[in-house]
Amino acid sequence: MDFLLDTHTFIWFINGDKLLPDNVIAKIKNIENQCFFSVASIWEIAIKMKLNKIYLQSDFNEITDFCLANDIEILPISFEHIQVLNNL
């Protein structure tokens, strides 16, 4: 099954937060599932960290390594994505 992780789910997962239910952790770690994380969420994390609204236990620069280690694919944003959004 495919899963797109939202920002809070990812933050809870990377921080090992107890707010993330065990069944969700199991789905993320299940190698039969494919997990995705948007670069837009990484951008959101960077902004919120600068505003001291969120905290990561890991260094921000380790997000890509964490995703690679946990088989989470980072999805890019293209100009075409923005065009679709603009035309909604």
Regions from the language model: what does each represent?
Residues 43, 64, 82:
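Positions that flank functional sites
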Residues 7-8, 45, 85:
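Generic structural signal for small/hydrophobic residues in well-ordered secondary structure
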Residues 1-37, 53-65:
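Short, well-structured N-terminal submotif of metal-dependent ribonuclease cores
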Residues 55-61, 69-88:
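Active-site neighborhoods of divalent-metal-dependent phosphate/nucleic-acid chemistry enzymes
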